[in-house]
Amino acid sequence: MSRRQRYRFGAAAAVAAAALTAAACSAPGASSSAPAASGTSGGASGSAAAGPIKIAVVDAQSGASSDLGQFEWRGVSLAVNQVNAAGGIGGRKIQLKLYDDQGDPTVGTELARKIAGDGDIAMLGTAESAVTIAMAPILKSEQIPNITSGQSVGLIAVHSPYLFLNGPTGLTYDSTLAKYVVTAKGYKKIAMLTNNDSYGTGEESSMTSALKALGITPVAAKVVPKDQTNMTPELTAIRSADPQVLFIGAEEAQSGLIVKQARALGLTAVIAEGAPAGTPLFLSTAGTANADGTIVSSPYLGNQASSAAQAFAAAYTAAYGSAPELHGAKAYDGAQVMIAALKVCNGCTGLNLANAIRAVKYQGLLGDFAYDGSGVGIFATAIGIITNGVIKPVS
């Protein structure tokens, strides 16, 4: 492993604790600056070559996705505080600025314009595919590279040379999940319940394609609005199809509600899902007993999965007082990819930075990053089973 691929923990964990200052921002365009090790504040300062390297972090700090936004912010802050503690990029410190997208694509569009005006040279986030897709045209026009935590295949359809993913697409999550459910477990009667936003639409498409490749047609397939909280009518219809497996394609809170309501209706099908099922919000919403046995497809199956994951979890916990999960790990990896690119090109910007990101080869928590022309750098997930509230990897 090369020097830029190694994780730097130890004393840097104490520095990372300073990043926990972000508060929820209620107004579109509102932001807060991370206390960079350089001690500078949010505005433009000095020459671009001498001042801090300014990077925007865009994630929900309020609204239904705010928990993901906090995980993302902490993962990014940990990585940046580690590199700043080690001297920064060619002696320049990275300065983060946090923007609250509220999980709203309209707010995201406004923030994309603000980021360009604020002088940020790159963006990390968002966790919401729909928000990232809304921001992408403006970021492309302004030549601002963006490493997103979204996973919808719709991100690829944007065709922006400035847009990169810090994890696999939904197609990878769902292909792995479908193969395990159908081939390894032998289930044939599979129902689907997805929502109608960018993430859910992508999941519906990806899982349908993955099942079709295995000769499976869902016994039931229902779609609900992303803000619907009572899925009883759809689940009742699904129950009548007597499925062996219920695949869910929705964000964390809604997925948890689906599981809770399914069990209340006596629906005993095995639950199968991608990234959302690996989060604390899913588990707390569904209830530990209801979530037990859920099959999860994810590139990050917990903080004990590898020595690197254990070291990351120790540093994260020391800094923030709580354990990380997938989104924190993804954000950390995305920040490390950005840092690696900035080191190689000596703090370059625009298309040069985008090209440097594309050339990065990085051994991350989620796997080995190697970007293709579409902006995807990770192409595999693994299977885990939720047991007593903990994801246990399947050998």
Regions found by a protein language model. Name each.
Residues 324-328, 339-391:
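Segments of small-molecule ligand-sensing domains
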Residues 42-75, 99-106, 127-130, 193-201, ...:
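Extracytoplasmic "Venus flytrap"
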